[in-house]
Amino acid sequence: KKFRVLGTKEGRAIAGLSMGGGGSFVYAQRHPDMFNAAYSTSGLLDHRYRPKKVHSYENIGWYWSVAATSPVEYVRNATAEQIEKLRTVRWMLDCGDDDGIIFTNVDFFVEMHREKIPVEFRVRNGKHNWAFWRESLPLILKLQIRNLLFS
């Protein structure tokens, strides 16, 4: 089958969950000309979250990848030009109130507000698990449909 797609920023969004949520924000921050919206659900958005196992070799690689690309630090250190570009993307994040990394999401929200970059942040009942993420997907799809209709 063939599907019609829009090959422009207005027809493109990026989303992810957990580390993928952080990754979606990293990519959208570095390529704001490509996406009209970026979504993160339960995203690991800063390196200050350090699980107990981070000192083992099997886990240290992903931890340092977050430290090197922190979406929170990106906003904190962005130039005026980068801030203007970030304002062209619709940002949305959600996280469960019992998720151990919720504070990285709060930090991102605070930094975005400090720079007056519009962002939607939702905290719902839930943990860092598939039960929470299954509820997030319909919300993300509804928001993107709205974005496509009004772009």
State the predicted function of each range:
Residues 1-151:
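Non-catalytic cap/lid and distal C-terminal segments of serine-dependent acyl enzymes
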